[in-house]
Amino acid sequence: MREEDIRSTAGHGTSNKDWWPNQLNLRILHQHSEKANPMGPDFNYREEFKKLDYWALKEDLRKLMTESQDWWPADFGHYGPLIIRMAWHSAGTYRIQDGRGGAESGAQRFAPLNSWPDNINLDKARRLLWPIKQKYGRRISWADLMILAGNVALESMGLKTIGFAGGRADVWEPEEDIYWGSEQQWLGRDRFGEEGKLEDPLAASEMGLIYVNPEGPGREPDPLKAAQQIRETFKRMGMNDEETVALIAGGHTFGKTHGAASPSHLGPEPEAAPIEEMGLGWKNSYGTGKGGDTITSGLEVTWTSSPTKWTSNFLWNLFGYEWELTKSPAGAWQWRPKNGAGEGTVPDAHDPNKRHAPGMLTTDIALRVDPVYEKIARRFLENPDEFAKAFARAWFKLTHRDLGPRSRYLGPEVPEEEFIWQDPLPKRDYDLIDEGDIAELKKRIQASGMSIREMVMTAWASASTFRGSDKRGGANGARIRLAPQIGWEVNEPEQLRPVLETLEGIQQEFNRSQTGRKRVSLADLIVLAGCVGIEQAARNAGFEITVPFTPGRVDATQEQTDVESFSYLEPVHDGFRNYLKRKFSVPAEHLLIDRANLLTLTAPEMTVLIGGLRVLDCNWGRTKHGVLTDRPGALTNDFFVNLLDMRWKWNATDDENVFEGRDRATGELKWTATRVDLIFGSNAQLRAIAEVYASNDGQEKFVQDFVKAWTKVMNLDRFDLLVKK
């Protein structure tokens, strides 16, 4: 090859996505593979964290805060405000709708987050932390370090935090599964519908922002409109009004914003910066490009007279002055005290001979003009201890919301208190059932009269609420019997309740018969019944198998279940049950991939589960769509065999989600199926997997793989088993 002929390299050029933009994105089911992870398959971050000299690390972080570096000088001689912003923006991407985002993976290091306009100059914060990360290596992840550094920053400035939990393992490549919006430009706002409703599952109001635009919606400096967006955005991030006020007022107690000059002085973001910038972005051509010449948001505001100390001064200033609109040197809308009030009360970040007036953002003024926010903010002003405690608790929630239940928490500063947002579970105070008990319970389940479909559907409904994104949901707790899950349409309440009553009867009878401390939970019994159903179905197909089962689940109470918070886990679509709550603009097969990703399934696991659940007649509403078998209730590979059989010609119907399979020779109607079903014959990659199971030698492999995938789903929230490993 002549060198002048080299125009590109491997992996470049026009992609399949360029040719076919609506193609299924199956890559999100295979991200974060061992091939991308330099730590190797045997690396166990939990075990490495336990070896960490935690207190020495905190001391190193404390020293870092006041050791200003010439290459990026600390505002007011303290890096605390910058580090807090980094930690906040790492955690603040979380949204409760799908549990994605947040601090748990350390994704701020990668695109797109590392180049968002709201994260300008946080690349400097991470570089300041690098010597400490380098020192402690594998024993502290970037994900944990960023949050712990935020805690230490707060503590070093006088706030008493309520604790810290480690356990966040780093990813090593960008997260491709998170939908951040469809806008093609930064700060785009196409995510709002005609009635002003923010698109699901998004929380941030504009592309590239963590929360809302500090100048106001679309840079309109209207505090009341800003308050409306703040309330919606923070709600979608799992925060109530009190937590919202505490976080904004507490966070803006520290530091300043940066708008020394026009953002036109900034160079490209890290992902677009020249190679010699070594991963840093936003090179600033104004003045020295740092210190007093720093440009970040374009806003130039210092809120308090002591920006490196925890005080109530933000609230005092907010209510102590009357405010008027002005513009920053960069031309951004912000607020200043009227009639020159407050001049000289605020220090300069870098020049001890300069003083300024305090400033506010439109989103700060929102706390004063919104009647609900104002009442909370004034209460905090009058009760500074309550304010400090409210911020500390909201900060812990913000930074730990996506870490999962307390059983995943690591470290010596884990709070003793249990919070409702952690989806708490009771501690087991009884002995677990043994193999003999399991065999006896299986017999009782078999004799109960429950059908294979009822047992499998109930177990699936219980376990498949799990979200790998924020580690919520799952079978542990048996919350399927509690509000709100007991009433979810997808769970077919009228059919679910009798099944639960039958299982509760078996549970009570077994527990009453015990003379010792041995008990079985309903959560375990639901999963065990699913095992019984699958074993019977395999037997119907000619296979004797044992579905793995490990007891240890407990039963949560209604008091331990936040109904509003759990309502976000309701499946409005579940392709595994061929369920759509309503018509969506997104095709059903794409929704299936989204659901499979939340269940941490691979494409083969998703495929085999669909094939198995269809032949077990586990469709919502008992529809026959995709039940491509004459032997429902037998765990056969019939779904794949018939889906790929050229005898059948598939035709669209008036319902865009339903298709008819007719005999090519006679035109006789044989099958009906949905888009979710047909995609396993239509999509080339999924068809390749389906062919494995449709082959003459594929039946046994199908059963084995189905059982493995099923067991994985049943145990997704068994973090106790992972700890034992």
Swiss-Prot record:
Cross-link (Tryptophyl-tyrosyl-methioninium (Trp-Tyr) (with M-237)): W88-Y211
Record-listed E.C. numbers: 1.11.1.21
CDD domains from the UniProt entry: catalase_peroxidase_1 (cd00649), catalase_peroxidase_2 (cd08200)
Alphabetical keyword list: Heme, Hydrogen peroxide, Iron, Metal-binding, Oxidoreductase, Peroxidase
Pfam families, A to Z: peroxidase
GO molecular function, one term: heme binding
Cross-link Tryptophyl-tyrosyl-methioninium (Tyr-Met) (with W-88) per UniProt, renumbered positions: Y211-M237
Broad class of enzyme this protein falls into: oxidoreductase
Gene3D superfamilies in UniProt: 1.10.520.10, Peroxidase, domain 2
GO BP annotations, alphabetical order: cellular response to hydrogen peroxide; hydrogen peroxide catabolic process
Record's function text: Bifunctional enzyme with both catalase and broad-spectrum peroxidase activity.
Family as reported in the entry's similarity comment: Belongs to the peroxidase family. Peroxidase/catalase subfamily.
UniProt protein name: Catalase-peroxidase
